[in-house]
């Protein structure tokens, strides 16, 4: 049901509880009171009924039907069209949830249209009904009360964001790999919050500038200034959060780059150490190879005389060379020549 609550107020006191929009219009005209109509996600017919009754501007009606509007204040003749973006901090999920409420403020009527559960306008209505003197000031009192409720609800959001940012600062230097994503998420929430709360400064300034022209009560003007002071404090805090998070992103990027550089340096040092080990192994292998060459060369040189000596040391009956007068000198000469030849060959090949 789109019609959540509506009533007719005379001198700040509720005088009736009509159940339909038609009954509301009739009772308003009958008692010459202020109508406060509360709608929740109304359909086109319900919005059009209100628009026809109070001569609402088609552009404002179109914005209300479409929803998803930025915070703004527009004046169409004697009617104010106000869009507010309330917010609340969901502690369990550590996120900021945004709502949307539209207000039509005109002579003798207030129409509130909520597109989300937030804010709790029933609480605002109860507080005003408990203070007939304030409610008797007319539709502007309702606007003030809704603004005050929305801005007051920004306080816990600021506190929640501040707590999250404190946690980020701890994670930033703790080496948490997920910190960059969390910083980005928080920065996105802070920017969304700035878009919701930022326009309120100009909106409240505009209301104050037109207060005298439209006969707004002086006490109500002072209350609006108090809301403005609260808004200025909140928007300044949000701006400081944004700067902190942007700096945190820069610091994190620097830390990541430094870690990458340190890792590359470590890998380079490890590679150099490995290359040095490889070089040493190569030198050792080369040295061993040279030693093997020398040993093999000398073994070959010694092998040739040993081979000749072994051949002529065999105990065969028939070995003609043994009867030669020059056999012994020839064997010695063969041993010597084979050793010299092999030595010169190995020397030429740098094996010795």
Q: What spans do the regions from the language model cover?
A:
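Peripheral, non-transmembrane regulatory/ligand-interaction domains of membrane transport proteins
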Residues: 1-240, 269-290, 321, 351-352
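Hydrophobic alpha-helical transmembrane segments and their immediately adjacent juxtamembrane loops
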Residues: 232-352
């Amino acid at each position: 049901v789109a019609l959540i609550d509506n009533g007719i107020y005379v001198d700040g006191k509720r005088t009736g509880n009509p159940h339909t929009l038609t009954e509301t219009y009739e009772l308003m005209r009958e008692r010459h009171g202020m109508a406060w109509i509360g709608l929740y996600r109304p359909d086109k017919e319900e919005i059009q009924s209100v628009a026809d009754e109070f001569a609402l501007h088609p552009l404002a009606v179109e914005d209300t039907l479409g929803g998803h509007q930025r915070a703004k204040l527009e004046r169409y003749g004697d009617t104010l069209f106000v869009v507010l973006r309330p917010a609340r901090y969901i502690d369990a999920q550590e996120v900021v949830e945004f709502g949307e409420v539209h207000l039509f403020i005109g002579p003798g009527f207030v129409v509130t249209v909520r597109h989300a559960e937030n804010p709790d306008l029933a609480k605002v209505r109860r507080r005003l009904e408990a203070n007939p003197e304030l409610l008797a000031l007319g539709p502007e009192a309702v606007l003030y009360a809704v603004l005050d409720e929305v801005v007051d609800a920004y306080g816990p959001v600021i506190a929640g964001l501040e707590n999250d940012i404190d946690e980020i600062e701890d994670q930033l230097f703790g080496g948490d790999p997920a910190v960059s994503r969390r910083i980005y998420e928080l920065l996105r929430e802070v920017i969304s919050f700035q878009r919701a709360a930022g326009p309120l400064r100009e909106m409240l300034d505009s209301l104050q500038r037109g207060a005298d022209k439209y006969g707004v009560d002086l006490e109500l003007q002072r209350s609006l200034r108090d809301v403005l002071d609260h808004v200025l404090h909140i928007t300044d805090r949000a701006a400081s959060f944004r700067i902190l998070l942007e700096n945190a992103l820069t610091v994190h990027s620097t830390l990541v780059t430094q870690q990458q550089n340190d890792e590359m340096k470590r890998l380079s040092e490890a590679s150099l150490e490995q290359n040095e080990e490889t070089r040493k192994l190569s030198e050792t292998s080369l040295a061993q190879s040279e030693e093997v060459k020398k040993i093999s060369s000398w073994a070959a040189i010694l092998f040739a005389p040993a081979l000749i000596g072994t051949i002529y040391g065999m105990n065969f009956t028939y070995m003609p060379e043994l009867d030669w007068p020059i056999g012994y000198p020839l064997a010695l000469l063969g041993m010597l020549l084979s050793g010299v030849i092999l030595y010169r060959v190995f020397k030429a090949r740098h094996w010795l």
